[in-house]
């Protein structure tokens, strides 16, 4: 079997004990093998390292991505949640290895502009590497979902791991309401305006919407 437009991210817990997390060669390659087996695939299109590892040398992590590509288990390498300076170092290592590094995956929205502050957005442009952003709607805050309270079936009440009452602050809601009024003046929904804002710069290659139900699309 073969993958079509499939990607895999590694950088969080895969198993208990040593090398079960972060960015070591053992972790990345073993977790990729496990994931391919579970998915019933021979390869993924993009294999991401999910986050910077403060303990493992960058050369080891990038070497593992290179090995994944050259072994035929991934077509391209990607990075997720890196800052600009570290991404540039990683890019130089991968270029020297002749490993195709094509994409960064980072959080980006009207409310979260970290990639502008940490240099990732500018560095990606300089290196000619794309950015695919996630949480462009700030987990539903930049839609009409929470403008008038918290619905019973929302992730705030049913899950709460990534969006909870502590993060859904009154300040954010007030800002979202103000943005919603601006969107109305423009003749569009808040969600549409928020997505257009993320895509306004050609540094952003694509956007992961992150819908939880088909009707949200």
Q: Where are the predicted features?
A:
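Active-site groove signature of glycoside hydrolases
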Residues: 36-56
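Short, small-residue-biased leader/transition segments that mark boundaries at the very start
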Residues: 1-7
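Short amphipathic alpha-helices and their capping/turn segments at secondary-structure boundaries
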Residues: 4, 31-37, 119-128
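Active-site mouth loops of central-metabolism enzymes
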Residues: 13-29, 50, 55
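Short, acidic/polar
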Residues: 23-39, 87-91
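Beta/alpha (TIM)-barrel catalytic core signal, keyed to glycine-rich beta->alpha loops juxtaposed to Asp/Glu
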Residues: 56-216
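Hydrophobic packing within well-folded, soluble alpha/beta domains
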Residues: 6, 35, 44-47, 65, ...
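A short acidic, helix-capping loop that chelates divalent metal ions and anchors anionic groups
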Residues: 12-18, 142, 216
């Amino acid at each position: 079997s073969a993958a079509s437009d499939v990607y895999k991210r590694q950088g969080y817990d895969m198993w208990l004990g040593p090398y079960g997390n972060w960015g070591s060669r053992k972790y990345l390659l073993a977790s990729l093998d496990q994931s391919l087996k579970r998915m019933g695939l021979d390869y993924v299109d993009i294999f991401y390292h999910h986050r910077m590892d403060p303990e493992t040398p960058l050369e080891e992590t990038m070497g593992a991505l290179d090995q994944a590509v050259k072994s035929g288990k991934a077509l391209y390498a990607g990075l997720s949640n890196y800052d600009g300076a570290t991404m540039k170092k990683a890019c130089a290592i991968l270029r020297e290895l002749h490993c195709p590094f094509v994409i960064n995956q980072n959080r980006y929205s009207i409310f979260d502009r970290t990639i502008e502050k940490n240099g990732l957005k500018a560095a990606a442009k300089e290196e000619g590497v794309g950015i695919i952003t996630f949480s462009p709607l700030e987990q539903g805050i930049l839609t009409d979902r929470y403008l008038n309270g918290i619905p019973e079936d929302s992730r705030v009440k049913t899950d709460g791991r990534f969006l909870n009452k502590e993060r859904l602050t009154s300040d954010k809601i007030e800002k979202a309401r103000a943005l919603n009024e601006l969107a109305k003046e423009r003749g569009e929904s808040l969600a549409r305006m928020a997505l257009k804002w993320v895509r306004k710069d050609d540094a952003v290659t694509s956007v992961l919407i992150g819908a939880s139900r088909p009707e949200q699309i």
